[in-house]
């Protein structure tokens, strides 16, 4: 019965959150095997298998934190990188960039989509871990400033509503 059990990241969360934190999610019951196979961990990359629009197929998000047992639904592909050679944040940014090779594996039909087997074969740039970390530092600073500006704008709008819509 949905509504009880474990948190599940679905397509809605993926398309609403580039960086997925410990947010409210749908709860689903799971067997032990399902929990083992679908568990997400911090720094897992999640990709959309399909989308109604080609630009959404292969969309990448990253799990930033999970407090509870959290799993992903079958419309997503989870990638867990070896952090000794690959900075997950670097590849999150890489797959969001114009340099992403994702377009090469998107298949077009009624719904655009990607297959896990094609994602496994995708050839990607592999700069040194030091360069990956430097790139992540810069891009994370920019992302954090954008998030702060969005929050400031929301707060300003709330203040306007309080002042002018009494």
Which sequence ranges carry the predicted segments?
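Amphipathic alpha-helical segments with low aromatic content
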Residues: 121-166
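Sequence-specific dsDNA recognition surfaces
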Residues: 1, 7, 12-45
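Short beta-strand-centered aromatic/proline hotspots
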Residues: 59-63
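Basic, amphipathic alpha-helical recognition segments used for DNA target recognition
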Residues: 1, 15-22, 54, 65-133
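Solvent-exposed alpha-helices and their adjacent loops that cap or buttress functional pockets
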Residues: 2, 38, 115-116, 140, ...
């Amino acid at each position: 019965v949905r509504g009880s059990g474990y948190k599940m990241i679905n397509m809605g969360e993926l398309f609403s959150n580039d960086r997925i934190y410990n947010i409210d999610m749908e709860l689903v019951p799971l067997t032990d095997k399902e929990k083992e196979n679908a568990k997400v961990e911090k720094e897992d990359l999640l990709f959309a298998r399909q989308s109604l629009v080609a630009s959404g197929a292969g969309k990448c998000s990253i799990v930033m934190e999970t407090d509870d047992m959290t799993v992903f639904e079958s419309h997503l592909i989870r990638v867990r990188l070896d952090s000794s050679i690959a900075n997950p944040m670097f590849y999150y940014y890489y797959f969001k960039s114009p340099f992403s090779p994702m377009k090469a594996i998107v298949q077009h039909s009624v719904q655009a989509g990607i297959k896990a087997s094609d994602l496994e074969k995708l050839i990607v740039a592999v700069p040194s871990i030091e360069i990956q970390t430097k790139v992540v530092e810069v891009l994370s600073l920019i992302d954090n400033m954008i998030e702060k500006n969005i929050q400031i704008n929301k707060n300003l709008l709330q203040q306007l509503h309080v002042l002018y819509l009494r």
